[in-house]
């Protein structure tokens, strides 16, 4: 039987990975570590698809980590994620449990599964001024020139692209100090969802979250003093809803552009996961359409080495 340190459940948005991970954690009597770059923020719930009800299975709450750990407006980064992951990972292991890592932020997943050596990167005002007038497309092209941790998966606003370039520039001239990060042997399960079904679920989920008050959530965040620029930085829902709230888009424009952006995001997530396979990760894909019991049985078989 392979000696795994953890189980990773990954997949694009709307693939059902969170209820799958929760059901698996319930079966194995363990806890979940989230790998979602936006669900770490408190009060950003509907816009990040933070379905906390998914973490209750048959009336039993499943303990989860790295959700609701930072205030809106804060620029949390992958260096901090590595640090916080390790604290959560070690606390779960000390209980004698096999942690379940679950999420769709490829850079977060890969940073801990591969143990990238990272360090905090200060702001570079001169570089920011130089890049300020570039479009997102131009910045994405600049970013492609680096041998980089980043791809365009989460770089969907000008500010995020500039920050990604800032990090790459800093790493180019500052050698990364040796920092111990444990080599983790993870069983990696990917949730494979048919493209048309994924698109249908994305649209349905978007309409549902809007009905549940996603616009009000963004208004509430701005009323709490979070600047529109900071919300736009988080991309996707927060970018387009903020543009609607401040009057830059009509409701119809917001919906159409946001729907398209989420579809594109899911496609980029799958591109990242396929890239992980090319970079040496073994991902065991399971159909999103299988009944939950069959998905769990699939993982148990893989844990046994079958």
From Swiss-Prot:
Catalyzes the transfer of a dimethylallyl group onto the adenine at position 37 in tRNAs that read codons beginning with uridine, leading to the formation of N6-(dimethylallyl)adenosine (i(6)A). It catalyses: adenosine(37) in tRNA + dimethylallyl diphosphate = N(6)-dimethylallyladenosine(37) in tRNA + diphosphate. Signal peptide: none annotated. The lineage of its organism: Bacteria, Pseudomonadati, Bacteroidota, Bacteroidia, Bacteroidales. Keywords: ATP-binding, Magnesium, Nucleotide-binding, Transferase, tRNA processing. It comes from Bacteroides thetaiotaomicron (strain ATCC 29148 / DSM 2079 / JCM 5827 / CCUG 10774 / NCTC 10582 / VPI-5482 / E50). This is tRNA dimethylallyltransferase 2. Monomer. GO terms for biological process: tRNA modification.
């Amino acid at each position: 039987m392979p000696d795994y340190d953890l189980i990773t459940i990954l997949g694009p948005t709307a693939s059902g990975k969170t209820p799958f991970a929760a059901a698996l954690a319930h079966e194995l009597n363990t806890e979940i570590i989230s790998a979602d770059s936006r669900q770490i923020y408190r009060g950003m719930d509907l816009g990040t698809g933070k379905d906390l009800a998914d973490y209750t299975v048959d009336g039993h709450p499943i303990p989860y980590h790295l959700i609701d750990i930072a205030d809106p407006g804060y620029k949390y980064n992958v260096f901090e994620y590595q640090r916080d992951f390790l604290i959560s990972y070690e606390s779960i292991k000390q209980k004698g449990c096999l942690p379940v890592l679950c999420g769709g932020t490829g850079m977060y997943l890969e940073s801990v599964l591969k143990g990238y050596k990272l360090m905090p990167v200060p702001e570079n005002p001169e570089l920011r001024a130089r890049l300020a007038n570039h479009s997102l497309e131009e910045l994405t092209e600049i970013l492609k020139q680096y041998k980089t941790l980043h791809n365009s998966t989460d770089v969907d606003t000008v500010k995020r692209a500039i920050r990604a370039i800032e990090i790459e520039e800093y790493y180019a001239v500052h050698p990364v100090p040796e920092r111990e990060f444990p080599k983790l042997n993870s069983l990696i399960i990917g949730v494979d969802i048919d493209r048309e079904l994924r698109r249908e679920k994305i649209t349905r989920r978007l309409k549902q979250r809007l009905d549940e008050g996603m616009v009000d959530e963004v208004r509430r965040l701005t009323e709490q003093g979070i600047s529109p620029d900071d919300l736009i930085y988080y991309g996707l829902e927060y970018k387009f809803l903020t543009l609607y709230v401040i009057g830059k888009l009509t409701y119809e424009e917001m919906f159409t552009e946001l729907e398209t952006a989420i579809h594109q995001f899911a496609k980029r997530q799958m591109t990242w996961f396929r890239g992980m396979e090319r970079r040496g990760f073994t991902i065991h894909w399971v159909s999103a359409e299988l009944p939950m019991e069959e998905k769990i049985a699939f993982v148990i078989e893989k844990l046994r080495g079958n």
